[in-house]
């Protein structure tokens, strides 16, 4: 067994750069059941931006907006729209993580530094990954505060209701044609990840378009990053649409785990979150395809939840429509009942569903 030179304890937080963090924070609190726990902005001594930290179980989302027109974050928003900037990784030693990765070829975004306040200190360091996305290593073993130094505790202005979201299962990146293997190699060689699964254009294709995907995972399996690229097809694939509207590579979706997907999706739908729809015929022979499952078929059909089985068990999953006007970032809700895979049996149904949405937008 080779030593894991980059031990990661899990996802620390995901930061989105957005046009209006105050309004985005309200959306994620109301619709997704997150709770506001901390804030940084002019009132806390941060003059150039406002950041809201939202939490549910083990998930932390940070929503950040710039406060001036010439702020660098504005250039990011102008190019990409609202999108994921930081996939932060919780580590025991930020400096070692940064040294190990930069010595293997990672591009440094920020050298190790210490953030301090009355609750202790946090060490952070950042490297570049695909597009304008970065990984920040966060070492918080000497910190007792709510989030990071510079943030103050802040509570939601209304009573939020959790909907059963537990932790981030995986985060998916979209890269340009011919770039997937480059980034898989980056994660393998620079970050010590292992290739978990490969899907080619025969696995993920429709009459019109196709994509290819490889999944990399860190040593303990807590961090999983599928990476997609478009494949040759008759028409524009969903990955090409994303790349066009995002203005380059970036995070396509964040998959969040629940232990009761029927409850979670029921709540999301009640609060106005829109999901991709599959035809009702998907359910006609579902049990023949996946075998016995614990759930009743009727609520799955009503909520449009998909099911797939692998050697280890089965999973239930559903995908939101994009959560902003550009057809870019969306969320997946997933419940694993033993399955360790990613729903290969649903790829075709999902892809066709996305193409129907693309058609409506005039982008197919």
Language-model region placement:
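N-terminal beta-strand motif that seeds the catalytic metal site of vicinal oxygen chelate
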Residues: 1-22, 84-87, 144-184, 247-256, ...
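Core segments of cupin and vicinal oxygen chelate
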Residues: 6-9, 15-60, 103, 112-118, ...
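Vicinal oxygen chelate
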Residues: 9-19, 52-53, 72-100, 104, ...
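Extended catalytic-interface subdomain
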Residues: 65, 82-87, 96-207, 212-214, ...
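Active-site-adjacent "gating/activation" loops or surface patches in catalytic cores
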Residues: 220-241
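Long compositionally biased, domain-poor regions of proteins
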Residues: 223-225, 247-323, 329-336
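Long, C-terminal catalytic modules of enzymes
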Residues: 311-315, 326-337, 341-350, 354-364
């Amino acid at each position: 067994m080779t030593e894991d030179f980059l031990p990661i304890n899990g996802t620390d937080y995901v930061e989105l750069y957005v046009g209006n963090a105050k309004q985005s924070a309200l959306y994620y609190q109301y619709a997704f059941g997150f709770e506001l726990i901390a804030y940084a902005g002019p009132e806390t001594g941060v003059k150039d931006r406002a950041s809201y930290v939202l939490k549910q179980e083990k998930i932390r989302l940070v929503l950040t907006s710039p406060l001036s027109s010439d702020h660098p974050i504005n250039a990011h928003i102008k190019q990409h729209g609202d999108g994921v900037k930081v996939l932060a990784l919780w580590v025991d030693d930020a400096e070692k993580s940064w040294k190990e990765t930069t010595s293997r070829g990672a591009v440094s975004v920020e050298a190790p530094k210490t953030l301090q306040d009355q609750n202790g200190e946090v060490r952070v360091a950042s490297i570049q990954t695909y597009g304008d996305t970065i990984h920040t290593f966060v070492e918080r073993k000497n910190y007792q505060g709510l989030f990071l130094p510079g943030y103050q505790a802040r509570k939601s202005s209304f009573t939020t209701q959790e909907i059963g979201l537990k932790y981030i299962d995986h985060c998916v990146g979209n890269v340009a044609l011919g770039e997937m293997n480059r980034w898989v190699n980056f994660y393998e060689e620079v970050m010590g990840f292992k290739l978990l699964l490969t899907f080619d254009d025969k696995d993920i294709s429709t009459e019109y378009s196709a994509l290819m995907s490889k999944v990399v995972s860190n040593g303990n399996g807590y961090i999983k990053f599928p990476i997609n690229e478009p494949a040759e097809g008759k028409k524009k694939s969903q990955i090409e649409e994303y790349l066009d509207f995002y203005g380059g590579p970036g995070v396509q979706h964040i998959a969040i785990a629940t232990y009761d997907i029927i409850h979670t999706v029921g709540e999301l739908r009640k609060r106005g979150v829109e999901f991709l729809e599959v035809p009702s015929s998907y359910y006609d022979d579902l049990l023949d395809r996946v075998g016995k499952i614990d759930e009743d078929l009727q609520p799955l059909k009503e909520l449009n939840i998909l099911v797939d089985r692998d050697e280890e068990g089965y999973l239930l999953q559903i995908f939101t429509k994009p959560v902003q006007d550009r057809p870019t970032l969306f969320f997946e809700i997933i419940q694993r009942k033993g399955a360790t895979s990613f729903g290969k049996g649903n790829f075709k149904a999902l892809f066709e569903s996305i193409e129907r949405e693309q058609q409506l937008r005039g982008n197919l």
